[in-house]
């Protein structure tokens, strides 16, 4: 079943029932929940998972419990959204789509999951016009449109006995007010001593007139399918599709440790290959930023 609650100041006709009907044949216990406000959808699902784990420990005599069921949690407004490396994600009702998908997952290799998620999102939002891909993917977790950030992905996991529960957070700009970005960019400059990023873009630059509900219906069910495909097949099923949208391939990049080089695509498990003066390096965890000379952060 599905639930939806909408604030009076920003009513949205969320397609919760349609998404549930599309997904439940594969995940019978799947639910969709929409909250008017939360600090972070990822934080909320991680809290629920920890609380359920503690409850299970207190009832250990009853046997080994199952991990929490699959859920899609949507927030109309996040007041403490999080991105990779603890970065803030600003979210206002109607301006952004913010949601998290949580489900038990047991892939043979977790490497490349965020890239697979990005592939699914980009393919779901790409206009079917037979043209070259418009939406690009910046390793490891950003969606780009016109070399500006459209959205981001945050993947977190929690242990549940011998199982793991994954929480996949997604934030997409539907329409981003300039004043929101200006404040965030100013704060970023004060906090990091780095130049402020370029202004983000939004889905309305690609699909004029769309709203967050439209975007959710476009991406939700295909994302669930992609995650299940990743569980069975790993990153191999997504590698070529990622390469077709790789925003960094052939570009000069700078790593957070100061190393500079040219991005040369991703490996079999999603690591970024960078050709440096000391040879080819495989990067799996360091933050990557495009050189300032490329005019993109």
PLM ranges: what are they?
Residues 1-130:
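N-terminal lobe of the biotin/lipoate ligase/transferase fold
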Residues 2-12, 27, 53, 106-135, ...:
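Long, positively charged amphipathic alpha-helical accessory segments at protein N-termini or as interdomain linkers
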């Amino acid at each position: 079943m599905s639930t939806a609650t909408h604030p009076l100041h920003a009513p949205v006709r969320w397609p919760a029932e349609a998404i549930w009907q599309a997904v439940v044949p594969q995940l019978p216990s799947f639910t969709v929940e929409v909250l008017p406000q939360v600090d972070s959808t990822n934080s909320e699902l991680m809290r629920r998972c920890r609380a359920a784990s503690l409850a299970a420990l207190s009832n250990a005599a009853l046997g080994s419990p199952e991990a929490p069921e699959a859920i899609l949690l949507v927030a109309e407004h996040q007041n403490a959204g999080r991105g990779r490396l603890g970065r803030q994600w600003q979210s206002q009702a109607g301006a952004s789509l913010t949601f998290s998908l949580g489900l038990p997952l047991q892939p043979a290799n977790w490497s490349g999951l965020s890239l697979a998620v990005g592939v699914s999102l980009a393919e779901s939002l790409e206009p079917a016009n037979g043209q070259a891909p418009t939406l690009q993917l910046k390793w490891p977790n950003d969606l780009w449109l016109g070399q500006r950030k459209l959205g981001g992905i945050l993947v977190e996991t929690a242990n549940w006995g011998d199982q793991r529960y994954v929480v996949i957070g997604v934030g997409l700009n539907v329409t981003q007010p300039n004043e929101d970005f200006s404040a965030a960019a100013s704060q970023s400059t004060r906090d990091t001593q780095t130049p402020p990023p370029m202004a983000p873009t939004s889905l309305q630059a690609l699909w004029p007139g769309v709203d967050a509900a439209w975007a959710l219906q476009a991406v939700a069910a295909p994302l669930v399918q992609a995650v299940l495909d990743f569980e069975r097949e790993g990153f191999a099923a997504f590698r070529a599709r990622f390469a077709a949208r790789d925003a960094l391939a052939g570009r000069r990049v700078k790593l957070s440790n100061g190393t500079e080089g040219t991005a040369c695509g991703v490996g079999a498990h999603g690591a970024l290959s960078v050709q440096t003066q000391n040879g080819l390096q495989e990067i799996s965890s360091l933050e990557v930023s495009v050189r300032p000379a490329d005019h993109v952060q």
